[in-house]
Amino acid sequence: VLRGMILNASPPTADAAEIDRQLRPERPLRNRGRPLTLGERKALARRPRGDALTELLRDPHPDVVAILLDNPQLTEREVVRVAAMRPAVPAALVLVAEHRRWSTRPGVRRALVFNPHTPVHVALRLVVTLSPADWGDIAEAHGLADPVRASARELHARAGPHRIRQAVGL
């Protein structure tokens, strides 16, 4: 059943107008000041640290996100913020899910699965890597795609009470 869900899952339909708005080539870094071009935002994302890096965490453009993810000063906490951001551009979330450094972090994977903008096929691939306690939370979460919730429900049921107690440290 689970294999069939993964093979037949398709990415959620996103509001095209919202994605177009988020992918504008120019956008202000803060609520004030002139809009920065995509090139300027990408250049700022390469800098080691600073206020601009914190502001860029809210930039949904996949090109900016890709550069941010490679920034050695970026912390897991900041990547979790990127993964949990809503609304989000699905392509940017895919970059987080596939990044060699960040895709192994349980907190990042959890944030991606709980983000309804994460493409279904990506969320299904990640949900099996989470804990039984997370599976129960995902199964009950509103706003997530039905295949993701069903997968978590099935995994949670198969885990049984003993494995769930182990996962939560009881």
Tell where the protein language model's regions lie, with residue ranges.
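Alpha-helical scaffold segments
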Residues: 1-170
